Amino acid sequence: MKEIQFKRAELEDKEVISHYFKHHTSRSCERTFANVYLWSRQYPVKWAIVEDALVFKSEDESHLAFAYPAGEPENVKKALEVLMEYSKERGIPFQMYNVTPDNFDMLEEWYPGRFQIEYNRDLADYVYEAEKLATLSGKKLHGKRNHINKFKTMYEGRWSYESVTKENLEDLSLIHI
């Protein structure tokens, strides 16, 4: 099997990655270039184009998983075949994340009964109304208000709002959440 050239997302990759996201939409926060770029500084996430499908790989010493590929269905299926072989060659069970119900339907059509889907609430996106999040109004956001107020008190005089520029972009990777 030809070796896949996975790499960390860099600013010059934005056009390619965004092209696939634009044409193969998802409501997941993981399908935005900003998210991919920033989190790849914190976590072992890399990307590659495999069979004309965009693939993300998360791998460390103890785990290997792939995001469901972004691409035309026939290319996604070809990419999945390559990724399953990639996992098999390493002796690691094939796993995917960021699989939507529609994606799972495609998997069932291509590979009946081969996969099981498990929902992991800890990895779910949170959706807020923009106005409520901006103002932190309402009972549901009380905890968020408290966290922000605690932060402001603890770090008084040591924090600021700044525009993100090329000069300070890499500093964002120093933020540990």
Language-model segment annotations:
Residues M1-L38:
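Generic N-terminal amphipathic/basic segments
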Residues E12, Y43, E61, R121-A124, ...:
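Sequence-level motif detector for i,i+2 pairs with an aromatic at +2
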Residues K14, C29, H63, A134-L136, ...:
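Residues in flexible loops and secondary-structure boundaries
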Residues H19, C29-D102:
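Conserved donor-binding loop and adjoining core beta-sheet/short helix segment
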Residues G71-E167:
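Acyl-donor-binding surface of acyltransferase catalytic domains
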